[in-house]
Amino acid sequence: MKVNHNHISNTGVNDSEDILEAQDEISIDNNKNQENIWNKKSIFHTWLLLCYSTGPVASMSRTYIPASIQSIAKNVGKTKMNQPCGTQGNDCYVKFGFMTVHHTSYVLYLRAVSTAIEGVVAIFLMGIADYSNYRKSFLIFSILVYGFLALPFIGLTNNDYQTLVLASILYSLLIIDDSIYQILEGSYIPLFMRADKKNPMQRGSVVAVLGLFLGNLGGITALVIGIIISYLSGTPESKGYHNFLLAITIAGCLTIGLSLFSALYIPNVQGKQRIDNFLVLPFKRFFNLLKDIQKYPMAFLYCISWVIWNVSFNNFMSMFLLLFRSTLGLGNSDAEYTVYTFMSYICSSWGSLVWMFLYQKWNSNIKYWGYSFLSVSLLANFWGCLGIHKLTPLGYQNRWEFWVFEVFYSATSSAMRSLNRCVYSSLLPEGNEAQYFGLEVTLGIASGWIGGLVNAVIQDRTNDDRFPFLPNMFLVVVSLIVYYYVDLQKGKNDVNNGNS
């Protein structure tokens, strides 16, 4: 009996083609369903509520927590003459591991070490997030941990070294967890953008701005609570930073409650099919990501500019807020500090919203907005450098300088952060959102801890709180130069060619 092998072969080929066509149809249907989900207003509002839930603890980790650690370090520390530290001035030193450092530098050293650990976590997360079917669960869990880490601060009222160490550990864990939820939260922005086929860039600007605005609004809520506590609960001299500790714990409760409510309605994201083991995947994807530089050069170039600017922004804010208290006096300026940090978040929210409305109205070249925002960053750091010379009456040595630059720097920096998230999302290949947002966080961490360490060493060795503004100013200059060479249109074309 003869068998028609050609018939069998052709039949096998036809079956394979039918299977591939069916898989393509299923993939197209899944993509359409995903687009329909991310077009729903209810889903967008739930995501915004989730952004709001991170705001209370995020604002505390940038304001009250480092201020509290600074105060505890001052109470524990000694002067060069082995006397108790005063409320003003720089003559105060405290033990940090195996060395003794300036009490303000202690916070900068702590942040540098925590950021280095944060980088390892970010590399692992950016490698697995796009392949996981539990992105929603990871996001909610990271925000819950964020809230729970803030709860113990209410008990850290003792002025001893053990309390300082415990506060430092909690602060470090908050910094590490911060990168986790930022990577996962930011990876949702491209999903909302791609759901709008008509004008994804305008959609992205709205999503990025409102997400940041709601986060700031959550921070404002916690800071209002801090103001009420500070002005109703005793004098600054009697209560001091203890008011901060209560506000931090209340912020943790808000974050936990709101994140649990959002978890009921936020949709999950279907992960990509993976072949490698989860332990191998992060490192393999990271090296594959570096190979994509030739394919998406503008995305990488923009990422570098964003990372350098973001490092300078974080350095500036940490130095600026600590300098405010050391210049005006620890303890007796605490009530004013609550209003000061509150105004920072008000200006941040105002800045990003104004930019969103102006951009939608004029729809001018989005890159020119970046130039103007970066110019303000350059001016703010240059102004701080003026104070290095002791005979100069300017350079953040007067109360009015802190308040004026707080308004302009906070507003333009918030707008710049929204702009970066929007533009960067338009340069990312589809299906790799978490990986590329993780790249931004990872590169920021890899370079940020070095910048923080350099600033801490400079401040510690020079005993000058304003000297670190000098290297920070050069970071802004480098960011501006890299930003100049980014061709946004070419970057978008690269993505379209890669997805086609």
Curated annotation (Swiss-Prot):
Entry keyword annotation includes Lipid biosynthesis: no
Any single biological process term in GO: protein transport
Regions that span the bilayer: 108-128, 137-157, 164-184, 209-229, 244-264, 304-324, 339-359, 368-388, 438-458, 467-487
Membrane-topology descriptor: Multi-pass membrane protein
Locations listed in the record: Vacuole membrane
InterPro entries attached to this UniProt entry: Atg22-like, ATG22/LtaA_families, MFS_trans_sf
Pfam families tied to this protein: ATG22 (PF11700)
Positions bearing carbohydrate: 14
One GO cellular component term: vacuolar membrane
Keywords for this protein: Autophagy, Glycoprotein, Membrane, Protein transport, Transmembrane, Transmembrane helix, Transport, Vacuole
Domain of life: Eukaryota
SUPFAM superfamilies linked: MFS general substrate transporter
Described function: May be required for lysis of autophagic vesicles after delivery to the vacuole.
Protein family membership: Belongs to the ATG22 family.
The name this protein goes by in its record: Autophagy-related protein 22
Organism: Candida albicans (strain SC5314 / ATCC MYA-2876)
